[in-house]
From Swiss-Prot:
Main location: cytoplasm
Biological processes annotated in GO: cytoplasmic translational termination
Protein name from the UniProt record: Ribosome-recycling factor
Keyword list, A-Z: Cytoplasm, Protein biosynthesis
One of the record's GO molecular function terms: ribosomal large subunit binding
Gene (UniProt): frr
HAMAP family (UniProt xref): RRF
UniProt GO cellular component terms: cytosol
InterPro entries associated with the record: Ribosome_recyc_fac (IPR002661), Ribosome_recyc_fac_dom (IPR023584), RRF_sf (IPR036191)
Sequence similarity: Belongs to the RRF family.
Pfam families to which the protein is assigned, alphabetical: RRF (PF01765)
Location in or out of the cell: Cytoplasm
Gene source species: Cereibacter sphaeroides (strain ATCC 17023 / DSM 158 / JCM 6121 / CCUG 31486 / LMG 2827 / NBRC 12203 / NCIMB 8253 / ATH 2.4.1.)
């Protein structure tokens, strides 16, 4: 039995928990909060040049005002395709073509929609918590496996405490991110 069998890779556990947090921030970025943000356009792909191309690869996206996103499409022949992709995306924003520029006025959210988005954000946060707890479970399984091949009881306790500390830190980060996102959503 080697010493490597008794080591727990905390860095790998931390990376997987960080991955869950990154996925949560990506999900939060896709929620429309009533404020203009280029991230609401990230999931949109345009049928360009014979393939599905991310919108941000077809032009520059700017946020000149709190309720306005402006897209300057580089290839003027793609303007109608970009406009159609935005309309068909289901993000609920009507693009306005103004020459070579597409303007996206972000409508004000009503109270009911804000509460609905807040619940969606809470759902995303819960998914992240579950993913983090699954990583914790995998780490604890590694510890049990190491114990079965000769890890000392004290070492098992130390590693378990380390994994739990990483889990607690990650869950706290999820809760903080959710609180911030819900505050942003509910702000009029």
């Amino acid at each position: 039995m080697s010493q490597d069998d008794l080591e727990i890779d905390l860095d790998a556990i931390q990376r997987r928990m960080d991955g869950a947090m990154h996925a949560l921030r990506t999900e939060f970025g896709s929620l429309r909060t009533g404020r203009a943000s280029a991230s609401i356009l990230e999931p949109i792909h345009v049928d360009a040049y014979g393939q599905q191309t991310p919108l941000n690869q077809l032009g520059t996206i700017n946020v000149p005002e709190p309720r306005m996103v402006v897209i300057n499409v580089w290839d003027k022949g793609m303007i109608s395709k970009v406009e159609r992709a935005i309309r068909d995306s289901g993000i609920g924003i009507n693009p306005v073509v103004d020459g070579p520029i597409i303007r996206l006025p972000i409508p004000e959210l009503n109270e009911e929609r804000r509460k609905e988005l807040s619940k969606v954000a809470a759902h995303y946060a819960e998914q992240a918590r579950v993913a983090i707890r699954n990583v914790r479970r995998d780490g604890m399984d590694q510890i049990k496996k190491a114990k079965s091949v000769g890890m000392a009881e004290d070492d098992q306790k130390m590693w378990s405490d380390e994994v739990q500390a990483l889990t607690d830190k990650a869950i706290a980060a999820v809760d903080k991110a959710l609180e911030e996102k819900q505050k942003e959503i509910m702000q009029v």
